[in-house]
Design a protein with these regions (language model features):
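Structural motif
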Residues: 1, 70-74, 98
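N-terminal strand-loop-strand
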Residues: 1-16, 43-44
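Short, solvent-exposed loop/turn segments at secondary-structure junctions
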Residues: 11, 52-59
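Nudix hydrolase/Nudix homology domain
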Residues: 11-14, 84, 88-136
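The catalytic Nudix box helix
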Residues: 16-50, 75
Length: 136
């Protein structure tokens, strides 16, 4: 899996590439734009994998996140053949790198949201959830 590596005043951590949708963009258009900005890749957007609510007041970073409620939609994506991990022209604040991480090594990564580890390792489960709820 390809992850953005970030650093803040507390720690280094990893997140999936992506971000906000601009007015007039479809979800795939927004994801392609965000991936160009963050990981310098023109991705092919595939199936919707997960939907997650994030209500900051319910989680450990409530004070730092300013009482937000976000809806996150996670898609499977394909990268162009020969892609080498690199930051795009407009990386996220705190982004210090882009890295491939084998799924069987996700436990060694400080991944956010943490709950994704389990779900990413069980993508083949025919009973897997799509809507994950308000989880972190």
């Amino acid at each position: 899996i390809l992850l953005q590596i970030k650093r803040d005043v507390l720690s280094q951590y990893a997140v999936l590439p992506g971000g906000g949708q601009h007015k007039g963009e479809t979800l795939p258009e927004a994801l392609r734009r965000e991936c160009l900005e963050e990981i310098n890749a023109d991705v092919e957007v595939g199936d919707l994998l997960f939907v997650r609510d994030y209500i900051s007041d319910h989680h450990e970073f409530a004070e730092a996140n300013g009482h937000v409620h976000e809806l996150e939609l996670l898609f499977a994506c394909s990268l162009p053949e020969g892609y080498q991990p690199q930051a795009g022209e407009d990386p996220d604040p705190g982004q210090i790198g882009v890295s491939w991480v084998p799924l069987d090594q996700l436990d060694a990564v400080n991944l956010y949201p943490r709950v994704l580890r389990y779900y990413l390792l069980h993508l083949d489960d025919p009973q897997r959830l799509i809507y994950l709820g308000d989880v972190n």
